[in-house]
């Protein structure tokens, strides 16, 4: 059964407005699969939660001069289907039906309806809401068909006063250190 997703009036989906893996698990339950990847130079940790119809991508970036201290984090949702108030969009929809729905959603929530657009011979994308809504399409004959929907949360700097974020990151760093010790020491 596909995971139900609803876009928030502010940022994110299903009431998730800040970056928190614990909140994601609380809202969507434990994922079907978890992938963890470390960059070759150990400057980032990428975690992917896989659900039916939803993938969550979390990235934690480190200062290049201090590999132990995280600098900022990002998170985005890759959805197959999402509700926009009284409308919805899904992979496989024609882009000409999706754009008016997104603009209606943005207008209703008093957001800027301007967008960025990029296209090549085979694919393209629309970026709305300060790049927090990203719609990818592929060209099939004379149609542009949606083949990706990503909803981003604004990136967050890792600041000492954000105790909840720091506690969650400490858990992630602990896992990273255990893996480092297992393979590299």
Language-model region placement:
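Short helix/turn-capping signatures at newly exposed starts of structured segments
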Residues: 1-185
